[in-house]
């Protein structure tokens, strides 16, 4: 045996802590890589949309009566004279530095506009998903527990309406009934006009900002304006969550362990909520996450009907004004939020369900 072999230190395999750290580091690296690739794909899609839409971004800046020299100068300043690959790389670079361009509609940087309008959409969608979860999950459980009953049929009709009733129609009916006729809720907008501008924006969400400022009257006024559009969004979330909860519960109620529990005389309430409902909580997280992301991106018509100053209303105005920087910026933010919520729900799914790890 050589001297090198005698003095060489034995190589010991990593212990349980080292193996756990390596697995977690690999999982985090894979998650970040997937997130980066998905975001890059989103950038490519938004860039492609900006080139496919039959709107000339140069004309939206210089106007229809600009001379050819002014048009060409603006086109060169916007980098549209460069090859498509260079335009895409320039677009990615600007996005990564937070530069989404200037909005023609407002005259402000798009990133500043989005920071103003997104909190309103986030506030409405968050209350909407809370309503959807609070009502949709119990209704889905009850429908499955009483399969075939009149209550099950009624809940299924509600679920069908959530897929067939247009959001703008439901919003208009809600305004006509609960605001114009019954006066139970506030009208369009986030606040009554005499409350507007009385509190300094901190988070951009009026419910939180009014509480931070100690303005209880403004808080309740904001609630009266928020409850109807959030309920309209919550109805569509409720329909989807109730339908999926019912489907998950019916699958669990047909399992052998549920039948065994009933044969042993376990109370029906315990069978429903402990034996059947517990296993579906993890897949419900994915359903709720998808519904939440859908509310954030699908609130455009609701915001237009209720004159809600959110990102959906901002996107609609930008489209009507051919404001491509604002359109692409809003689309990018909505897509990024959708991706982020789906990734978070996927992480929660893996954390709560050991079989998915």
Identify the role of each PLM range.
Residues 18, 34, 38-46, 120, ...:
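Helix-terminus/capping and membrane-interface signal
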Residues 39-44, 162-183, 288-292:
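Hydrophobic alpha-helical membrane-insertion segments
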Residues 1-35, 147-148, 152, 347-357:
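Transmembrane alpha-helical segments of polytopic membrane transport and secretion proteins
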Residues 2-5, 12-24, 59, 81-137:
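An internal, D/E-rich "acidic patch" concept
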Residues 24, 28, 32, 70, ...:
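Hydrophobic alpha-helical segments of integral membrane proteins
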Residues 38-89, 178-218:
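Hydrophobic alpha-helical transmembrane segments of membrane transport/permease proteins
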Residues 24-26, 42, 118-151, 198-357:
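Alpha-helical transmembrane segments of integral membrane proteins
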Residues 23-32, 139-174, 282:
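Cytoplasmic-entry segments and transmembrane alpha-helices of multi-pass inner-membrane transporters
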């Amino acid at each position: 045996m050589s001297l090198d072999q005698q003095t060489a230190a034995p190589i010991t395999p990593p212990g349980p802590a080292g193996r756990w750290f390596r697995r977690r580091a690999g999982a985090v690296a894979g998650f970040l890589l997937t997130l980066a690739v998905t975001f890059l794909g989103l950038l490519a899609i938004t860039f492609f949309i900006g080139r496919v839409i039959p709107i000339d971004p140069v004309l939206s800046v210089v106007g229809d009566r600009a001379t050819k020299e002014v048009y060409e100068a603006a086109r060169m300043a916007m980098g549209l004279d460069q090859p498509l690959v260079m335009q895409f790389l320039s677009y990615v670079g600007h996005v990564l530095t937070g530069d989404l361009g200037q909005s023609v509609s407002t005259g402000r940087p798009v990133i500043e506009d989005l920071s103003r309008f997104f909190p309103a959409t986030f506030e409405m969608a968050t209350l909407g998903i809370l309503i959807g979860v609070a009502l949709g999950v119990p209704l889905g459980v009850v429908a499955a527990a009483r399969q075939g009953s009149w209550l099950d049929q009624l809940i299924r009709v509600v679920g069908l309406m959530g897929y067939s009733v247009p959001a703008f129609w439901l919003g208009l009916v809600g305004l006509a009934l609960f605001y114009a006729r019954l006066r139970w809720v506030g009208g369009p907008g986030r606040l009554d006009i005499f409350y507007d501008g009385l509190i300094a924006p901190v988070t951009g969400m009026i419910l939180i900002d009014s509480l931070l400022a100690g303005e209880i009257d403004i808080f309740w006024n904001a609630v009266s304006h928020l409850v109807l559009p959030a309920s309209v969004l919550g109805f569509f979330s409720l329909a989807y969550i109730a339908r999926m909860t019912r489907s998950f519960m019916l699958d669990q109620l047909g399992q052998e362990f549920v039948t065994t529990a009933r044969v042993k005389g376990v109370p029906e309430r315990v069978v429903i909520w402990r034996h059947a409902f517990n296993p579906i909580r993890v897949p419900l997280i994915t359903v709720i996450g998808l519904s939440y992301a859908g509310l954030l991106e699908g609130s455009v018509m609701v915001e237009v009907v209720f004159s809600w100053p959110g990102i959906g209303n901002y996107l609609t105005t930008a489209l009507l004004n051919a404001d491509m920087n604002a359109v692409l910026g809003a689309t990018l933010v909505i897509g990024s939020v959708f991706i982020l919520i789906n990734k978070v729900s996927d992480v929660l799914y893996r954390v709560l369900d050991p079989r998915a790890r």
